[in-house]
Amino acid sequence: MSSHAARPQRWDLFCRVIDNLGDAAVCWRLARQLAQDPGQSVRLWIDQPDVLARLVPGVRAGRSQQGVRIEAWRPDALALIRPSRNDVADRVIAGFGCELPPAYRAAMRQRRPVWINLEYFSAEGWTRGSHGLPSPKSDGLTEYFFFPGLGAETGGVLCEPNLLAERAAFEQDPWARSGFLDRLGLSPKPGQRIASLFAYPNAPWPGLLEALARTGLPWTVLVPQGVLTEINSSAWPAGLAVQRIPFLSQDDYDRLLWCCDLNLVRGEDSLIRALWAGRPMIWQAYPQAEQAHLPKVAAWLDHLLGALEPPPGKGAAPRQGSVACNSDMPGSGPGLSPAHSSPASPDAAIRQAWLAWNADPNAPPVASAIHDALAASVRWQALSAALCRNEARLPSLAQRLLAFIDSRL
């Protein structure tokens, strides 16, 4: 993002924590990436700084961390209840459409900053038509909708400049992997498969564990403390183990995803981090009434299952610091597959596993669906690596945001 170095700006990013960890995680990642651009001054206003502190050790309200000033969004915050024109930043981002503090919003009329409504991520096609649209206000200000998504016609996804290079170095260093797993209390034997499980309380986890047990392969399922507390770690068939792990920082969660043969994730932030892991995963969308979440799942699947087709930007250079997503990772390939072949096509098996995990009433039972998808692990791995590779060719969300703002000036 160095092309913007000659344009120092002040940024205020507002975040109300609704989905617990995910909202804080996304806003922090964006704030940190903006702050890495020389000359940028970034404040992150967050109503629950303690949630962010769980993800980023050392974060405290009233202090700067990695170039970002963390401010507690409280009713008594002076800069929010009596802001002057100079208190308003040049660039104002409302995380996930949150309502800005009334007095700050009123002061924006004098400063007239660029105002961005950062929406939730979606892979659905309709976001391409809504991304970047203006919303003029009665006081003369304009709010712009910014939709993160997949492909070149959206706001993109968050990715640190050197993330994929760091992942490659980690995967190529067996001591780094074993040392990390050892810190979690895990010493996998040769041939041991590892799955991470981060899910909402309604996740059909018994079907997942049954599917893993039916493969006949040794699996260890890593579940964070406080997630799916009803899982009993001691009563499973031979070859299957469930192990609790401590809550991890953002950086360590990335390493966990890089270590696993299968990642089950939930929400927006962990979905994108699993994308950059380039490994087979199943995403649990936030459950909604009348299965309103299923189109979101289907939209991601369309991108995943079409990832090996030539992308629109074929031939574009990867972003700085990126590397190709490896399709031949430790633990992937034929050795991950169960002994039998799925009767369904590989792509159909992968789709059905995702839909079953997300409670699609028309999907097969969870255990059968995931079992069949694991039988298609070679294809699953290739698709996962290809989708990672396709998105890595494109500018990141932070890069697109800076370019979008420049185009409006």
Language-model segments: what does each one mean?
Residues 5, 309-346:
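Intrinsically disordered, low-complexity terminal tails and inter-domain linkers enriched
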Residues 13-141:
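Active-site and donor-binding regions of nucleotide-sugar-utilizing enzymes
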Residues 49-55, 124-126, 203-207, 227-233:
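Short, charged/polar "capping" segments at the starts of alpha-helices
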Residues 111-114, 217, 279:
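A short helix->loop->beta-strand "cap" motif at the edges of active sites that frequently abuts
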Residues 119-203:
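A nucleotide-sugar donor-handling region in carbohydrate enzymes
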Residues 159-160, 312, 316, 340-409:
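C-terminal amphipathic helix plus adjacent low-complexity
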